[in-house]
Design a protein with these regions (language model features):
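Short loop/turn segments at strand-loop or loop-helix junctions that form parts
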Residues: 29-32, 95-96, 151-153
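Conserved Rossmann-like nucleotide-cofactor binding loop
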Residues: 34, 74, 220
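Active-site phosphate-binding/coordination module
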Residues: 46-141
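Mg2+-dependent phosphoryl-transfer enzymes with acidic/Ser/Thr/Gly-rich catalytic loops
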Residues: 2-9, 22, 112, 197-270
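Conserved acidic, metal-coordinating active-site core of Asp-based
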Residues: 136, 142-213, 219-228, 232, ...
Length: 270
């Protein structure tokens, strides 16, 4: 059951204590709306200073792995995450279809999810999607490695509905096997059927994590939250239906939770 902010504050220490004590902890975090506020220009998104500080503290601890798990394609996630080649932070892009590990090798493939690419000219499909939204004010198409996304954050409700109808019709006709996802002012289609649950499972196996902390703010994050194990902890950032055990109001409040987790885990290792 989700909790409101007051309940979360009361029970925070109790919720974090098992994670602070676990032998190997994976801290997996969505990026947009979770570490960084949602903004109109997606490539300008950056994690809040408090988020960066908490992440650095966690990543510096022994037996503690930090990962960004995002719907962004891997290349874009590295840009907004200010991610260098020597970074200790793991990445899962495209909802778990692309990976980057600290060895520096990008695992640019679907990790456990099916794909549907037969008879689909993805480049032509993206180009036609661009044409559809060209005369719809505020709507635009984000090209992704395994598909595309319709953004309507800056559109009126009427224009957003029109763009959604026309893009849906295009994909039904041309790529009916592609996975459809909805989020906050976004409609995404992908040839990969992988979800963030797949990403968490892959990262858990890769890192040998004995417990997982996962936080996210959108519908696609619920794939991961719903598949967490009993010893894990899911946190929902902001409003919306969720199966997360805890809820925080926004990215700033989550940064405080991450900082608390870092302090508690560091104390366990003194």
């Amino acid at each position: 059951m989700s909790m409101d902010s007051s309940e979360m504050t009361t029970d925070l220490t109790a919720a974090l204590e098992p994670l602070a004590a676990t032998p190997v902890l994976l801290v997996a975090l969505d990026f947009d709306g979770t570490l960084a506020p949602l903004i109109d220009e997606p490539m300008a998104a950056r994690a809040l200073p408090a988020s960066k500080e908490a992440i650095a503290s966690l990543a510096a601890l022994p037996d503690t792995v930090v990962a960004f798990v995002s719907g962004r394609m891997l290349a874009d996630l590295r840009v907004i995450g200010e991610h260098r080649d020597d970074s200790p932070i793991y990445l899962a892009g495209s909802h778990g279809a692309e990976f980057w590990y600290p060895t520096g090798a990008a695992a640019n493939h679907v990790h456990g999810g099916d794909t549907d690419t037969d008879d689909v000219d993805a480049d032509a499909l993206r180009a036609d999607a661009d044409l559809i939204v060209a005369d719809i004010e505020g709507a635009w198409i984000e090209h992704k490695a395994l598909g595309f996304a319709l953004h309507s954050r800056m559109s009126t409700a009427e224009d957003a509905a029109r763009a959604t109808r026309e893009i849906d019709a295009l994909v039904v006709e041309r790529a009916p096997g592609w996975r459809r996802r909805t989020g906050q002012d976004i409609l995404e289609f992908s040839s990969s059927h992988a979800g963030k649950d797949v990403a968490i499972a892959a990262l858990r196996e890769e890192t040998g994590a004995t417990a997982v902390f996962f936080a996210g703010d959108d519908v696609t994050d619920e794939d991961a939250i719903a598949h967490l194990s009993d010893g894990d902890l899911g946190v929902r950032v902001g409003p919306g239906e969720s199966s997360a055990r805890l809820r925080v109001a926004d990215a700033q409040e989550l940064a405080g939770v991450l900082s608390t987790l870092a302090r508690m885990r560091a104390a366990r290792r003194e």
